[in-house]
Amino acid sequence: MRSLFLILLGLAAVSAIGEWENFKTKFGKKYANSEEESHRMSVFMDKLKFIQEHNERYDKGEVTYWLKINNFSDLTHEEVLATKTGMTRRRHPLSVLPKSAPTTPMAADVDWRNKGAVTPVKDQGQCGSCWAFSAVAALEGAHFLKTGDLVSLSEQNLVDCSSSYGNQGCNGGWPYQAYQYIIANRGIDTESSYPYKAIDDNCRYDAGNIGATVSSYVEPASGDESALQHAVQNEGPVSVCIDAGQSSFGSYGGGVYYEPNCDSWYANHAVTAVGYGTDANGGDYWIVKNSWGAWWGESGYIKMARNRDNNCAIATYSVYPVV
C-alpha cells in the first residue's frame, strides 16, 4: 500500500512538472537566473494545487465557477494585486447628474458585444491603470451608440494627462475622474494616435486626434443592482469598480463568479459591465470586460454573480459617460 502511495505521489509530481514546462512554453516565460525560476516554479506549484482543489469542488457542484492557469500564474496573489489592479482609496460622493430610479421594464438579457459596441479585450500590463481601461471601454460603447462608429480610444492619454483630476497613472485612479478630464479637455485621443505603453509618461494629447468627447457622466444609485441593470440595458456599457482581492479572481476560468468572501463596498479594481444574463446552473450574472488580456477568464471576460447582495461590490461604484 505504501509503495502504491509513493508511485501515485511520484506520478503527481511528474504531472505538475509537465504543467510547469507547458506553462513556460505557452506564455514564453524566461527568468533572469535559476534562483528566480525556482521561486516562480514554487509560486506556480502552489497556485496549481489551489486551482486543482477548487476545480474538484466545481466538479462536485459546490461552486459555480472554475479556475485555470493563465499568463500570470507564476505571480503571487499580492503581486497580481499590486500590478494588475489600480484603485485609489477614496470616493467622490456626488453625481454630476441626478440619479434616477429605473422606470422601464428590464430585458431578460443584454450583451452589447453582440451589438458591436465593445472593442476587443485589451491588456493593461504591469501598470495599475484599470481605471483608464474601464472608463475608456464604457466611453467606446457610448460613442458607438450615438454615432454608429466603434473607435478604440487611448487609455495612455488618460494615464499621462489626468493627474490634475486626482488620477495617479499606473498607481491608480477612478473612472469618474477620467471623465472629468475628458469633459474639461473636450475630448480624448484615439488609441491609434496615442498607443498604450503601460508606463507613466509625459502628456502628448493632440486635439487633432480626438476620437470621442464626453458632456457629462452619471453614477447609478450606489449598491443598487437594479439601477445598474437599468443603466446597462438603456445606456450601454457601464464602468464598475469591484473587489478583486480574493485569490480566486486572478485564476478565474469560467462559470458564474460568486465569492462569499468578497466585500460589498470595498473596491480595488475597475472593469466594465457590458451586459447581463442568467445561467441555468450559476444563476443571474453580469457580463464583465476585464483588462488583463484574452488569456484571462472567458477570453478576457468574467461572469460575475448578479442579484446576490451586491457580491464583490459590483454595483457600489458605477458610472457611465454621456456623449
Curated annotation (Swiss-Prot):
GO terms for cellular component: extracellular region. GO terms for biological process: collagen catabolic process; digestion; protein catabolic process; proteolysis. Optimum temperature is 40 degrees Celsius but displays considerable activity as low as 20 degrees Celsius. Thermostable. Retains 60% of initial activity after incubation at 50 degrees Celsius for 2 hours. The active site is at C130, H269, N290. InterPro entries: Papain-like_cys_pep_sf, Pept_asp_AS, Pept_cys_AS, Pept_his_AS, Peptidase_C1A, Peptidase_C1A_C, Peptidase_C1A_papain-like, Prot_inhib_I29. It is found in: Secreted. GO terms for molecular function: cysteine-type peptidase activity. PANTHER family: CYSTEINE PROTEASE FAMILY C1-RELATED. This is Crustapain. The gene is Cys.
